[in-house]
Amino acid sequence: VNLGAILKRHDPDLLLTMWGDTWSLPYLLKLSKEWGIPLPLNRESGRQVLHRPERTYFTYGQVVHRGRQVHLFGRAHIDGHNAMLFHDYGLEGVFELARLTSLPLQTVARVSPGSGISAMQMLTALRTGVLVPWHKQQAERPKTALDLLRADQGGLVYQPITGLHRDVAEIDFISMYPSIMAHFNVSPETVGAERPTAELVPELGVIIEQEQSGLVPQTLQPLLDKRIAFKERLMTLPDWDPRRKVYQARSTAHKWLLVTCFGYLGYKNARFGRIEAHEAVTAYGREALLRAKEAAEDLGFTVLHMYVDGLWVQKDGASDITDFQPVLDEIITRTGLPVAMDGIYSWIAFLPSRVDARLPVANRYFGVYKDGSHKIRGIEARRRDTPSWIVELQLALLDQLAGAQSFGELPNRLPGAVSLLRQAWLDLKRGRVPLEGLVASQRLSKELGDYQVPSLAARAAIQLSKIGKQVKQGQRVRFLYTRGDPGVHAWDLPDPPNPTTIDLRQYQKLLLRAANSILQPLGVDENTLHDWMYSNAGYFGPPGSLPPNQPITLSYWRSRLPLFLKACRPQKAAPRADLYRAGD
């Protein structure tokens, strides 16, 4: 009754909810029907609320679940939890997408950016008198096996030089693939078109018409121009300006449209998609990155890493943006594509594989910029299944290292990092970590009946199903690691777990793994951390400073004793009665 009165009094244009699609609005409508109390969610009284069913689909190697939807008439309803990428660009980003795609506000909030790009392409086609196909019917052109191997290569990825590096600049191509489509006129109808102005695609032997602008470049060019304009405005606005948040949200919405447009170019069901155009874009991208590498090396820089649309370069004596500006200018000259300096790292660490430390991993690194901020990729803090307490500890270790005043002071920050780790170890052992911080989550990749050996997420979902809570394929399940069978306790069960059943060893393992990712570049391996924590051994100095078989002399002990005592001194923390107590 109160909600109905509020809606009539204020008559809002927009209802912004969390879980409104899947829970609150369906529940309120159900109560309204059962009790006979009208609930005017719609402005148009003669229309019924539109319900759209939930669905599960497979995309990019993972199963995704989209909850049911509640659409209103006369006013908009957006569910922040069920809206696509709402956490990235918020309400301002949704408004910007609606302006760009001409899709209804409630629709554009819930569909993927790919659907937005498809709508923009159809608008371009209608404006230019091009018929829009109902379904894609154009098949891929026949290829020999050699042609397929040559064309189907994707982006260029180098193996980075592992370890710590100082004064490294990260140079990125601005919206590389969309820029390639616009600059080289890559579109389904221009690829393979024999015209006097056609140009040859590197490596592929395919030609692209350059005389008449294609449908895809016509769609993307205004979007690219608008995003660059927002970027330029953001660079001139002070941090306190309220417009920064709005411009950033709109720019992020543009970014997702531009990121998706490349994938849609090769999507089998895209109306204006064509695999040959997709392959041409990646070929141009590989050529551009190689030219960028050659430009940097010709100017005396060392290329530490290259990854699809960016490269990391270093040169003795180069530490300021003016030192790297000649590289940017030369890359623009040689490629014809826009580039920008993502930032200059005081130091950056490229990490090796966990399976074989001799092998580098392309997208597993972390570094600290000159302004003190940091960037992480491929480590535990970026994974959605990592407990929040582990994430906080890993970021605290990184902040500890980031406090070094210079590259040479990094080893001196190691005792403080070990102290943080030991304090976290003791907090876990003594039951001082809130259960909320230990919750892990994983996606349910199959229906429960399809598992031959249930995963951890499946075991937690089975527990929930026994109390009537059904988890669908593609949804995430939250749980705690416990000892014994079944090894997990579903977090959404009504009864909390017995504190003595928490699997401390599993969380200790996760803790050491996360700490190892940060401390490994300083020479500390996981076995060393294991020994330090389990045996309560002290820290004497950076690993490698003392040969394994060399005896510890009295002078060495005296020089390292302050560091040892500092690392072994845990911070005092009062126990709390509302937190669990470890059983062992």
Regions found by a protein language model. Give the residues of each.
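Extended catalytic-interface subdomain
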Residues: 65-130
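Conserved phosphoryl-transfer catalytic core
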Residues: 194-207, 211-212
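Conserved alpha/beta enzyme-core scaffolds, especially Rossmann-like or related mixed alpha/beta domains
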Residues: 7-15, 71-84, 99-108, 271-272, ...
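Conserved DEDDh/DEDDy metal-dependent 3′-5′ exonuclease domain
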Residues: 1-91
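Gly-rich Lys/Arg/Thr-decorated short loops/hinges at beta-loop-alpha junctions or inter-strand turns
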Residues: 264-283
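Cytochrome P450 catalytic domain signature, combining two hallmark sequence patches
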Residues: 37-43, 92-98, 185-196
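Active-site cores of enzymes that catalyze phosphoryl transfer or operate on phosphate-rich substrates
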Residues: 1, 79, 211-270
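DNA-dependent DNA polymerase catalytic subunits
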Residues: 104-193, 242, 246, 250, ...
